From Swiss-Prot:
InterPro entries: Furin-like_Cys-rich_dom, Furin_repeat, GF_recep_IV, Growth_fac_rcpt_cys_sf, Kinase-like_dom_sf, Prot_kinase_dom, Rcpt_L-dom, Rcpt_L-dom_sf. Belongs to the protein kinase superfamily. Tyr protein kinase family. EGF receptor subfamily. It catalyses: L-tyrosyl-[protein] + ATP = O-phospho-L-tyrosyl-[protein] + ADP + H(+). Residues 707-964 form the Protein kinase domain. GO terms for molecular function: ATP binding; ErbB-3 class receptor binding; identical protein binding; neuregulin binding; neuregulin receptor activity; protein heterodimerization activity; protein kinase activity; protein tyrosine kinase activator activity. Tyrosine-protein kinase that plays an essential role as cell surface receptor for neuregulins. Binds to neuregulin-1 (NRG1) and is activated by it; ligand-binding increases phosphorylation on tyrosine residues and promotes its association with the p85 subunit of phosphatidylinositol 3-kinase. May also be activated by CSPG5. Involved in the regulation of myeloid cell differentiation. Residues 1028-1052, 1077-1156, 1181-1212 are annotated as: Disordered. This is Receptor tyrosine-protein kinase erbB-3. The active site is at D832 (proton acceptor). The chain crosses the membrane at residues 642-662. The gene is Erbb3. The keyword Secreted does not apply. Monomer and homodimer. Heterodimer with each of the other ERBB receptors (Potential). Interacts with CSPG5, PA2G4, GRB7 and MUC1. Interacts with MYOC. Found in a ternary complex with NRG1 and ITGAV:ITGB3 or ITGA6:ITGB4.
Amino acid sequence: MSAIGTLQVLGFLLSLARGSEMGNSQAVCPGTLNGLSVTGDADNQYQTLYKLYEKCEVVMGNLEIVLTGHNADLSFLQWIREVTGYVLVAMNEFSVLPLPNLRVVRGTQVYDGKFAIFVMLNYNTNSSHALRQLRFTQLTEILLGGVYIEKNDKLCHMDTIDWRDIVRVPDAEIVVKNNGGNCPPCHEVCKGRCWGPGPEDCQILTKTICAPQCNGRCFGPNPNQCCHDECAGGCSGPQDTDCFACRHFNDSGACVPRCPAPLVYNKLTFQLEPNPHIKYQYGGVCVASCPHNFVVDQTFCVRACPADKMEVDKNGLKMCEPCRGLCPKACEGTGSGSRYQTVDSSNIDGFVNCTKILGNLDFLITGLNGDPWHKIPALDPEKLNVFRTVREITGYLNIQSWPPHMHNFSVFSNLTTIGGRSLYNRGFSLLIMKNLNVTSLGFRSLKEISAGRVYISANQQLCYHHSLNWTRLLRGPAEERLDIKYNRPLGECVAEGKVCDPLCSSGGCWGPGPGQCLSCRNYSREGVCVTHCNVLQGEPREFVHEAHCFSCHPECQPMEGTSTCNGSGSDACARCAHFRDGPHCVNSCPHGILGAKGPIYKYPDAQNECRPCHENCTQGCKGPELQDCLGQAEVLMSKPHLVIAVTVGLTVIFLILGGSFLYWRGRRIQNKRAMRRYLERGESIEPLDPSEKANKVLARIFKETELRKLKVLGSGVFGTVHKGIWIPEGESIKIPVCIKVIEDKSGRQSFQAVTDHMLAVGSLDHAHIVRLLGLCPGSSLQLVTQYLPLGSLLDHVRQHRETLGPQLLLNWGVQIAKGMYYLEEHSMVHRDLALRNVMLKSPSQVQVADFGVADLLPPDDKQLLHSEAKTPIKWMALESIHFGKYTHQSDVWSYGVTVWELMTFGAEPYAGLRLAEIPDLLEKGERLAQPQICTIDVYMVMVKCWMIDENIRPTFKELANEFTRMARDPPRYLVIKRASGPGIPPAAEPSALSTKELQDAELEPDLDLDLDVEVEEEGLATTLGSALSLPTGTLTRPRGSQSLLSPSSGYMPMNQSNLGEACLDSAVLGGREQFSRPISLHPIPRGRQTSESSEGHVTGSEAELQERVSMCRSRSRSRSPRPRGDSAYHSQRHSLLTPVTPLSPPGLEEEDGNGYVMPDTHLRGTSSSREGTLSSVGLSSVLGTEEEDEDEEYEYMNRKRRGSPARPPRPGSLEELGYEYMDVGSDLSASLGSTQSCPLHPMAIVPSAGTTPDEDYEYMNRRRGAGGSGGDYAAMGACPAAEQGYEEMRAFQGPGHQAPHVRYARLKTLRSLEATDSAFDNPDYWHSRLFPKANAQRI
């Protein structure tokens, strides 16, 4: 550290001892506000400075040093460390201003409106006396204000000071010019910055040398040498107790932002409690109590209360409290700090009805006789009587001139206190001088002079002041504060009889008569001394309290020989003059006075005591009985009349309540109709050009004044979503809406104009997309949609996963696919499809949201940043991640992830993986793992959505068809393991929402618009609850179906080695050769060896696995027992035995208006056979046994369909078909990616004991009749090719019993597959397996 740094530290340590005692005991003295005006000569100025600032450390105000001589010893100023106002040094002759400990000038008041230090004209033109040095060696902080130092002929080194290091405000004005020249240079250790020539005069730098990490001051150049934020003027360490001065407040040596509050929060009781360590803010110091001449306002020591508060005395503490009603009037005084210098004719009317003078009162000769210079006329002496209402003066009272005919100051006869918070000249609070005609003071009510000195001089006729005991009036020693001289001698006053009244005590008096006594010798009555009180005789009778006579209440009866009362109230009388009502003496008994329960009537008894009348008396009484009532009717109200009156009254009340209810309901219905009118009505946008067609846009163009945002619901990649209200222009209704604010962060695009894409988004209307109510162009685009209080489907499935059943999940998948198909028809690419962007309109209807938003932004804003946390990488297709390519087929990929979220009840995809790792995993062929509740059929639909080749992925039309088919038999495709009681049907789904949530949704005004639809859905839910009655075993998923991957990973690898050697791992247990389960890369349910899709074929990995399983089983001929409790097992066999029924007419589809698919639960006994099916084959020929040979099984597995009835023709247009109904062939399903593959070998069923083969045959082959196919499938948009057909599978319901065990039949080996064909990242493999060409051959 350099030498200057060493000196800085030494300087700091030198003052540390005094700095540590900053908050414990500080000598605080008041400042002045005289400016350049002075009274008296240089000696008087010096004496004033000495008395004000001797041993002073903190100046509460301004330090003004003006017109001081050259021989003045100012060493008493060396203890001043802080000035709260400004420092003024002007017109002085001394050579050095010794303020070596001054550290901080706060600048709460600034000179000339902008300067905290003002130094000017400190020299004598007629001599060599002049100011040569400002010894401010410790000054390091000016909190407010600038610096002005000019025209000081001998003052040196001011231009060497770095004032920017001292001044805190960066733009403060600094003027330093025209000062002394030919000054000696700074000492070399000061490096050009000094207050004087010596090495001890170096400037201490505490800001410009600091490291950038420091916010304020520092004690060294290193980053760890920063001062505390509450420090001002530097520090010796980093703590708040190491500050040389405090920026805000000093609390016992520690710098704090505020003093301890009067109330503190108790964490145990959760309440605000009084703080036992409360302190008050007195200037920059926290004190335990304010000075006696200040008042407490909350936690501040103030000179006067604010205008809306009044001063009260609480437990000896003067406090400011809000006035109850009109406050005592406080008026501004005169003198320093006021706009008036004296009381004169121009301002005396402002003192009318004043009870308190805030400041001072000055009576000067220019005020009484007038001021011709300022054109102020003379004062009318009678107007001085306005001061008779004054009770307190907070400053000083200065009377230097008084009207000649007024011989005392009796206009101040009610003045009780002179506060002395601001003092005159040399510290006077009461100054009376040069009043030649005044004979007495007349301050008969004055009780206290809180601070300051008393100066009474040169009043030639003044008497009575000699007798006053000033110690009763003054706080502190009276000898040092009294300066009474040059008045009329005491002997002359006594000779003329101008002495105190004999009734006055030894305390003296203010003038002649018993009313001017400072205190009384005997008693006083209303301020006048008396010899005795009228206790036993005289009028009015009185009682005595602390030597004061107080009158009894007028209702007291005067007593002879004893006291009449013992207090001033009506309850303190010994005897009443008229009547007594309880303890009080009254002029008359109460008659009709309103009480808590009605009018009160009383009568006087024989002893003049007031007694209550009967409760039925309404006009008074003369006795306690009912017959004593005055004005009572002869016939009282009978009981029947009372009953009639009560009945009529209640009827009127009910009519009023009923009318109010009907009025409220009518207004509510009216508001609902208005809301429906605004929400359902679209707007036609007129063409801009005659050649353009009119565009029917359902959305509106809103004005910003019609929308009001309430709270933020969330934020995403493209903007922020707010909950708000729409107030249509000219209407009073408030419609709850969702407002999505889209902003262009680059600022290159504005949304002032309505584009074609905006109109295209506004024209979309579908049951399964969130309709856009309107948009508001501007600097940011605001999209307005209907507010759906049920929230997103993601939050819903997470909260209600225990109550959701397979029917709801599959129907939601259908509705999402239909909504996306509608967007595809209108060439709208979503780009951000995820479960969070699917909203729940009702418990059974969902809608896709946030579509078309990305196209509203410029191309650069749609580029993907893998590091951006909000970019939906996990939902995006590979071509979108790598190339930013977004198509309807990339939305299909996102749809697969959305369905995966739905089937995992809101799990996060690829949990635990960084976003940058996901593209590499997808390229390696790894995909999300099979959800636990999904069969292989549902999972394979997801896998097809995640194909690398986008052309191989299914379309939304095919996806809607596939999920519609699966929704007919939900337990067959989704197995949700959930505990159910014996009396609860396992297939009956509970409500996805609680009763309270449904009620809250119904209370939302926007949900009332779909009231009719919700009623239909409630009826539908009731039908579903009774219709879905399957055996308990159909909902039970075997525990053997578990993923081999860690649940936290959230994906499954798809590039694994083939399973060709899996069948070789066998073990011999109990003499039987049993197969060990092959190492699967995705869960395979037990009891399901083939695909459960209705097309009857298997995909690539499945076919490969089943071929090897078939080969192993055909060699070993094992008979492993398998459970038969899985509905998928029965439905698989049933698909081989059930004929495909013709397509039902569109009018018979079991689907409600919201896309909710009804499960096919109406069972029929039989149905007509169809050529090419296996319905006519007997059980013995279809179900293989152990004795059957392999040739028969092989022949069965290679059996082909003979033929099919002709398919219905393809509809001519989408309007003929409608997107709700997608066409399928009568015999072949247009399911996703189906192909005609080999039928599988059936599995032999070995019934358990007690079950006959006939019963089993009847149970397993039960199917519907022809009439049951009416609601089987929804019509699809186009017929598939013949090569892509597959057989139809139907759900069925058993009679309530089932075989407990099943055994696998011997399976014949199918066509072998090469290992190279089974790679999941080979598009040719998937294309050949899932989507065969037209010339593919069947086997």
